[in-house]
Amino acid sequence: MLEFELREIDRFDRAICISTDEMAFFSNVTGKVKLYYLPHFVERGKLIEKKKDIDIVFVGSSNEHNQRGLIWFLEDVYPRLKEYNFSIAIIGEIVDKIDLAKYSNIISMRHVEKLEDIYSRTKIAISPLQSGTGLKIKIVEALSYGIPVVCTFKSIIGFPNKLENGCIIADEPKIFANAIIELIKDEKLYNEMQKQALRQYEMIFNANRAQESIRNIFQIESKIK
């Protein structure tokens, strides 16, 4: 796959990278190609006034990286959270691949009509990925709703800044569990992480900001007077 990407990218004068890590890599291995950074952007999430009855949410497809990450969470992190009786929601096609019935206080939904309904009820999101590359879109979505994220370092690959971005990074099960507990229990910390999440979204992933970047990349003059 890498050889294919390197061969194909050299056919073009310009290339767009949605990840700063990928941009840094390609800048070292390509010659003539002009590289631009354009992260995946989303519209600002609109929260609905609802009771926050979901403590933790994981949203994901059924790909092998999500499966591996969720299994790690369920086997190594979840047992450390059981005494707190947190409400956990697993959303997406991932629920077809993992038997969740044996876990108490976990609700699973293969499909939801509007993710905003789930995010409006959610306190924090998790991304326990153990493998994979590229920008994790579900983290971006959570940040757009001002939802703090507890994640592994693998999950944060592709973000231009790894600190003060609305995410707490933890690669060890005990540290991951403690980060979840502290974030849910400590209101002051939670409020600060919410602010970081929204600030990160506005600075990097806001759709309006992306439009200006696109104009610069394609050298399109803005028609906004």
Residue ranges and their predicted role:
Residues 1-15:
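Membrane-proximal helix-turn-helix segments that form the acceptor-binding/catalytic region
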